[in-house]
């Protein structure tokens, strides 16, 4: 089905992580008139965190959620990280025009988030992916790692290119 035809419910929930739940992977949703639930766990007044989480989780929806090959799930997680970075950056354009009081806080959030991961050049990112491939393939969501540094490092690198040519976002619809 086309993305515009999808019913998406966005809800706040009280857990330690946000999540996207597609109908195709959840039997309890079979009789519900919704295709995806997106659960966010940030506070209502934490705009930057809401933007970050929503961009990440909505990217899973755009990609049809998770790839069939579990070993490739790290790619979708890194693309979602890129989307979060991209949306945080363009949110400042919106805030400057409509809610200037949020610009400084959003920029501070973005800088703080980006500082938690490495900044690598082309050869550096290739070496990084090669050196971490085993971990990327077996633990794409970095479940036992605080802050998801592998996904953040790769997503941050990819975001630089997507920010230059936003047409690149069209490609993520084909990753499933």
Where are these regions (language model features)?
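Post-HExxH zinc-binding segment in Zn-dependent metallohydrolases
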Residues: 73-120
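Auxiliary, metal-adjacent structural segments of Zn-dependent hydrolase domains
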Residues: 1-45
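Short acidic, glycine/Ser/Thr-rich loop/turn "cap" segments at secondary-structure junctions
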Residues: 61-70, 137-143
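Active-site recognition of the HExxH zinc-binding catalytic motif
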Residues: 51-68, 77, 81, 85
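Sec-exported extracytoplasmic/periplasmic mature domains
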Residues: 5, 63, 84-93, 163
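Surface-exposed patches in mature extracellular/periplasmic domains of secreted proteins
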Residues: 8-17, 67-73, 91-102, 170-174
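Short pre-active-site segment immediately N-terminal to the catalytic Zn-binding motif
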Residues: 35-54, 65-72
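Pan-zinc metallopeptidase signature
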Residues: 120-176
């Amino acid at each position: 089905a086309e993305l515009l035809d999808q019913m998406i419910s966005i809800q706040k929930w009280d857990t330690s992580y946000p999540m996207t739940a597609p109908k195709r992977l959840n039997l309890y949703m079979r009789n519900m008139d919704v295709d995806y639930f997106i659960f966010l766990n940030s506070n209502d007044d934490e705009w930057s965190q809401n933007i970050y989480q929503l961009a990440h989780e909505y990217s899973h929806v755009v990609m049809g959620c998770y790839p069939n090959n579990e070993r490739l799930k790290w790619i979708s997680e890194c693309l979602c990280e890129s989307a979060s970075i991209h949306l945080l950056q363009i949110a400042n354009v919106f805030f400057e025009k409509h809610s200037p009081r949020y610009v400084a806080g959003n920029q501070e959030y973005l800088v703080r988030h980006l500082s938690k991961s490495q900044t690598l050049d082309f050869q550096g990112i290739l070496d990084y992916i090669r050196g971490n491939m085993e971990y990327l393939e077996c633990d794409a969501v970095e479940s036992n790692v605080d802050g998801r540094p592998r996904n953040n490092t790769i997503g941050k690198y990819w975001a630089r290119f997507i920010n230059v040519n936003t047409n690149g976002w069209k490609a993520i619809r084909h990753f499933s």
